[in-house]
Amino acid sequence: MTENAAPTRAGFVALIGEPNAGKSTLTNAMVGAKVSIVTHKVQTTRARIRGVALEGAAQIVFVDTPGLFRPRRRLDRAMVAAAWGGAADADIVVLMVEAHRGMTDGVRAILETLNERRDPKQIVALAINKIDRVKSEVLLKLTQDLNAAYPFAETFMISAEKGYGVADLRAWLGASLPEGPWMYPEDQIADVPLRMIAAEITREKLTLRLHQELPYQLTVETENWEERKDGSVRIDQVVYVMRDGHKGILLGHKGETAKAVSKAAREELVEFLGRKVHLFLQVKVRPNWLEEKERFDEMGLDFRDGNA
């Protein structure tokens, strides 16, 4: 480092908020690449995904947490525990609130928990997302109400999808992190095994394709990852569903749904990995997968956190 060079900074930034608040979209926008899956359905993110972004001399490790909601199942409870665990471990917490939904009961519950868990050593900021959906006077009132409920260090108006305000937020985060060496190599954009990213990409395609409750009752695991001599990779994945009827829906007429999902997932994996991908999907019925520790381990969740 030269005498006049800025000191390096590094730290964790946890993005928290209700389901579908835009946390995964913001993570991807900050990193400049897709590391979290994004769909129009709520509760898509299940585990804590870490995306790594550079801002000048700062390395920002974004922790995209599952949405905070009232849990009903073991999986729900483990997801919420992972979200608050990510927040507790972070140097900076960013609460994301959807501008058009405003001060919901869910947001109030999160604010209440933030006040209960207040840590003087931790910075908490507010990011009001999707600002293009509301009028300025509505936005001003929401900003005042949220800041009256919690003493945020800073408030940002953003649209993660359209990129409004994202650069300003990233610059502030980089400047606010503690001085210290970088935690990851300069070219690393995620702290997630490739096997998990591959499974998440396939689950995203399933979630976009399927309807109602089925996306929440399935999981995808990468069973085999084989590097081939020609530079390509063979990926074998299993989709676990809870009922025979679910398997039929997922396969579709003459296997058309499964083929379409496989094609879409393979195309994105090729783009992500930069090489040829041979993707093979199997669908298996496993009625109690939601109660199996192995499934939670594969998703990066703590099975014990799901205890009632």
Curated annotation (Swiss-Prot):
It is found in: Cytoplasm; Cell inner membrane. Keywords: Cell inner membrane, Cell membrane, Cytoplasm, GTP-binding, Membrane, Nucleotide-binding, Ribosome biogenesis, RNA-binding, rRNA-binding. Residues 158-160 are annotated as: G5. InterPro entries: G_ERA_dom, GTP-bd, GTPase_Era-like, KH_dom-like_a/b, KH_dom_type_2, KH_sf_prok-type, P-loop_NTPase, Small_GTP-bd. Pfam families: KH_2, MMR_HSR1. CDD domains: Era, KH-II_Era. Residues 9-179 form the Era-type G domain. Residues 210-287 form the KH type-2 domain. GTP binds at residues 17-24, 64-68, 129-132. The keyword Metal-binding does not apply. Residues 129-132 are annotated as: G4. Residues 64-67 are annotated as: G3. Residues 17-24 are annotated as: G1. GO terms for biological process: ribosomal small subunit assembly. GO terms for cellular component: cytosol; plasma membrane. It is a peripheral membrane protein. SUPFAM superfamilies: P-loop containing nucleoside triphosphate hydrolases, Prokaryotic type KH domain (KH-domain type II). An essential GTPase that binds both GDP and GTP, with rapid nucleotide exchange. Plays a role in 16S rRNA processing and 30S ribosomal subunit biogenesis and possibly also in cell cycle regulation and energy metabolism. HAMAP family: GTPase_Era. Belongs to the TRAFAC class TrmE-Era-EngA-EngB-Septin-like GTPase superfamily. Era GTPase family. Monomer. This is GTPase Era. The gene is era.
